Design a protein with these regions (language model features):
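Beta-strand/loop-rich accessory regions of lumenal/periplasmic or secreted enzymes
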Residues: 1-146
């Protein structure tokens, strides 16, 4: 039997992808477009899904030239993204999005060395803005995020 102690366990939910290893468990939501649970050594580190932010603190110069008025759409832009596309890669191979009933073809004992999930998110700005967020996880629980 293959040694699964140094592998990443993949759990295919109806609307989520779970990744579990020694001392960690992560859950990614297809409907929310991001990570919704980051549990390390029994401690939960997220209380809601991760969201992008496109705003920064205003400076005196910003206030003087009306920046806050012209750019106010960006203050709330990251709050309600629309999930346009989701791609799941298991060991660098793209698979069909494993939502019901496709996820039923997988067992609850899938072990891999790495997984990646990419979310293409659209923000309601003028013009529309799209951002691709990629989460790559290895068997040690290390997460590499690319935006």
């Amino acid at each position: 039997m293959e040694n699964t102690a140094t592998k990443l366990r993949v759990i295919y939910g109806d609307c989520t992808l779970g990744l579990k290893g020694k001392g960690f468990h992560y859950i990614f939501s297809y409907t929310r477009g991001g990570m919704e649970s980051l549990n390390k050594n029994g401690k939960e580190w997220l209380y809601r899904e991760t969201l992008s932010t496109f705003w920064r603190a205003l400076t005196d110069n910003d206030r003087g030239n009306g920046f806050e008025y012209r750019s106010s759409v960006w203050l709330g832009a990251g709050k309600y993204p629309k999930v346009k596309q989701i791609q799941v890669k298991i060991e660098d191979t793209a698979i069909e999005l494993p939502i019901a009933p496709v996820n039923n073809q997988y067992s609850n004992t899938e072990y891999v060395s790495s997984a990646e999930i990419l979310f293409t998110l659209e923000y309601n700005t003028v013009p529309k803005t799209e951002v691709v967020v990629s989460y790559r996880i290895n068997a040690l629980g290390e997460i590499k995020v690319n935006v």
